[in-house]
């Protein structure tokens, strides 16, 4: 297998459909056109032609599109054959194409990888293709499209350019120490550095919003048996996702629902009631419940309001609170307000949000929805936003750390060499986002998660 091979893959989903598309990219795409079509179509024009087998018989008839490189998606010669979407027809056509020497099936994401390697798009834009396909909401799709069009990359490139200018200024101060003007102490470098840090903080904030849109928030409903956890899952999901009975311990395994609140994706997880297990099946369910709790972004601590008047989680169940991860946010949900007569709504107790509601009737559930949205700091009115991945957030965080360390060197010791090194490392972190400095292993992992024909 060579990167110089001409590759072919189906660009439409598998199965039956009105249209099926095969995409070919590489040096032999021209030969494929002349062999299968009998001619080379006019560049960037739709040509309705028969697709022929080796013996000259017609396999299908459809539209052929020819994009000579470098003016194509991949930067190479690209041929698209758009025929009927029957799997048998597409398979016959694919087999015919693969009889031509030098052609092979594309790896997942290889078309996008070649576009990246040929400078047709940067790494953040390439990732946006997969994010656009996988978008689970309208807002996520719009943000992915913004990233594909270069919104995220433009912000990162602006930071890289600012760091380049700053590094030139610092290097000049180091190389010409005998000049009358002390560049390091006259305040200009500090002012420029503060501007870059402020711009980076703004990009980090937008990237966190983009990560929320892409990754979603994992919320685990936990508590004792029969507290109403499954009823709350159903209320949030808007359907009967979980079985609800008066029998304690009805939920034995983890139940997952994916919902959206004003465009924000939420992964709601209902868990088995936490208690001393009565059998092996329940023990496994409780063990899985704790695994989910430890990986959660937030826990909804479900309390049966008819069993206690306490509102402080440490008073309600100290052993449960003691076992939770130290920094895990908790929302106390006092359920069955329709029975206890408690006033619906949200308050605060010991630094934790407290919400009184009735999962059975749905009263107060909207308060919980708004609380979940606000707790993540999600801005539903965000215009021109972009999607971001965890690796993007990590790169931005590392760049911010290097800039802060560089500032400390500047203010503490006027150490120009150390400041220059921190600026270089910050610039390298930012360049990893767009792929200017990225390891081959990381590129392989990123593109292998794509669809075959992308």
Swiss-Prot record:
One of its GO terms (molecular function) is GTPase activity. Its cofactor is K(+). Pfam families: MMR_HSR1 (PF01926), MnmE_helical (PF12631), TrmE_N (PF10396). Its main location: cytoplasm. Its EC number is 3.6.-.-. The keyword DNA-binding does not apply. The keyword Transmembrane helix does not apply. GO terms for cellular component: cytosol. Residues 216-377 form the TrmE-type G domain. Mg(2+) binds at residues 230, 251. It is found in: Cytoplasm. (6S)-5-formyl-5,6,7,8-tetrahydrofolate binds at residues 23, 80, 120, 454. Transmembrane segments: none annotated. Belongs to the TRAFAC class TrmE-Era-EngA-EngB-Septin-like GTPase superfamily. TrmE GTPase family. PANTHER family: TRNA MODIFICATION GTPASE GTPBP3, TRNA MODIFICATION GTPASE GTPBP3, MITOCHONDRIAL. This is tRNA modification GTPase MnmE. The gene is mnmE.
